[in-house]
């Protein structure tokens, strides 16, 4: 199977998101990379499902709460930007202060 560098990046991000999902299900608090991966995956999946950029920007702020991540993580993640493929092309989805 041949994958482009972009496809490899998406696959790696998705895998990290799955790890984060499992750790969260076990009741563990997520660290920085896990938090970013989980939020990014939720955004990419939403785009795949046909949601709008505005919907994803709103939903991206509801993926995690401060109680679900390690201390200091909400302050470290000020913005997350994810390039997603929509039916009408590729767009950049930005989420400001994603963990509240």
From Swiss-Prot:
Gene name in the database record: ureA
Leader sequence segment: none
GO cellular component annotations of the record: cytoplasm
Family in the record: Belongs to the urease gamma subunit family.
Keywords in alphabetical order: Cytoplasm, Hydrolase
Ranges in a coiled coil: none
HAMAP family from the UniProt entry: Urease_gamma
EC number(s) from the headed UniProt entry: 3.5.1.5
InterPro entries for the chain: Urease_gamma, Urease_gamma/gamma-beta_su, Urease_gamma_sf, Urease_subunit
Subcellular location: Cytoplasm
Main location: cytoplasm
Molecular functions (GO terms): nickel cation binding; urease activity
Catalytic activity as recorded in UniProt: urea + 2 H2O + H(+) = hydrogencarbonate + 2 NH4(+)
Protein name, entry field: Urease subunit gamma
Keyword Lipid biosynthesis among record annotations: no
Chain segments annotated as transmembrane: none
Pathway it works in: Nitrogen metabolism; urea degradation; CO(2) and NH(3) from urea (urease route): step 1/1
Pfam families per UniProt: Urease_gamma
GO terms, biological process: urea catabolic process
Subunit structure: Heterotrimer of UreA (gamma), UreB (beta) and UreC (alpha) subunits. Three heterotrimers associate to form the active enzyme.
């Amino acid at each position: 199977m041949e994958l482009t560098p972009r496809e490899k990046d998406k696959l790696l991000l998705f895998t990290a998101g799955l790890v984060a999902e499992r750790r969260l299900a076990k009741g563990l608090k997520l660290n920085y990379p896990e938090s970013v991966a989980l939020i990014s995956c939720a955004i990419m999946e939403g785009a795949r499902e046909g949601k709008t950029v505005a919907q994803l920007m709103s939903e991206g702020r509801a993926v995690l709460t401060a109680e679900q991540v390690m201390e200091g993580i909400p302050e470290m993640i000020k913005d997350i930007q994810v390039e997603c493929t929509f039916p009408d092309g590729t767009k950049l989805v930005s989420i400001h202060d994603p963990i509240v």
